[in-house]
Swiss-Prot record:
The keyword Cytoplasm applies. The last Arg residue of the ACP-binding site is essential for the weak association between ACP/AcpP and FabH. It comes from the Bacteria. It catalyses: malonyl-[ACP] + acetyl-CoA + H(+) = 3-oxobutanoyl-[ACP] + CO2 + CoA. GO terms for molecular function: 3-oxoacyl-[acyl-carrier-protein] synthase activity; beta-ketoacyl-acyl-carrier-protein synthase III activity. Keywords: Acyltransferase, Cytoplasm, Fatty acid biosynthesis, Fatty acid metabolism, Lipid biosynthesis, Lipid metabolism, Multifunctional enzyme, Transferase. This is Beta-ketoacyl-[acyl-carrier-protein] synthase III. GO terms for cellular component: cytoplasm. The lineage of its organism: Bacteria, Pseudomonadati, Pseudomonadota, Alphaproteobacteria, Hyphomicrobiales. It comes from Rhizobium johnstonii (strain DSM 114642 / LMG 32736 / 3841) (Rhizobium leguminosarum bv. viciae).
Amino acid sequence: MIRSVVRGFGAALPKRVMTNRDMEAIVDTSDEWIVQRTGIRQRYVAGDDETTASLGEAAARAALANGGLTPADIDLVICATSTPDNTFPATSVNIQNRLGMSHGFAFDVQAVCTGFVYAVTTADAYIRGGLAKRVLVIGAETFSRILDWNDRTTCVLFGDGAGAIILEATEGEGTVADRGVLTAHLRSDGSHKEKLYVDGGPSTTGTVGKLRMEGREVFKYAVGMITDVIQAAFDSTGTTADDLDWLVPHQANRRIIDGSAKKLNIDAAKVVITVDLHGNTSAASIPLALATAAGDGRIKKGDLVMLEAMGGGFTWGAVLLRW
């Protein structure tokens, strides 16, 4: 049985760091308020010379170096983003070009904060279907470009960055002991689209628009949706929270992360937290967290790892893999 095994990982962050103290100078907020409600202490903000594609390229090159590969070894590039450099061509094609690739194929996935989970699931399907041997999966965002910096309820939450992994086709035994992606579960419900959205677009306003969010409404649904899809991943593989080595959640809000882990009886020591350092980087948050925890040695070969996210739409999903 073909499995999609993680061959390499990487991350990239903008040069500029904005702390909560910096945010106090922009809007009516405080470090105490932000930390208490979100767990965020700082975030990275892209400069004029940094774009979604440039950050994605840097993360991709880091993943290639980590995996001992070159761009010539990649068959497919998938980039999850809601903040593309252009309406078209796709950011993935831009990154492909930046990497010097003129072979293979590339496309973007847009599922907001769940984008990386969708992208990993898509890459796994291409690998298992025999259409690609190695897939570069990137989550890259510059959410600072779509924030209303006068809206204190949203501008303090988001940051910029990129993360990447390389999935490689590897022969497995077809059991949960295999390395690689074991199962994936994706969901969406468009009836919630007005709770988290951007108030612009090419075919409606002809503008980029700004992010708008009904924070309390999103919070109300988040824990239930996240835990349901994680449980589905456990059930489909015959595993439990006790078997899990690491939960790598979308880094949106510390209270949502803690609430989800508690509901599923997942030990807090097994949860990777980077929201304090990066803020909510949408589709980039999970690969950034993966790169952090794998880079410092916490996530090791053979570990059972759960990825989960929820985003605008609503979209939500989970991927269970063995590192």
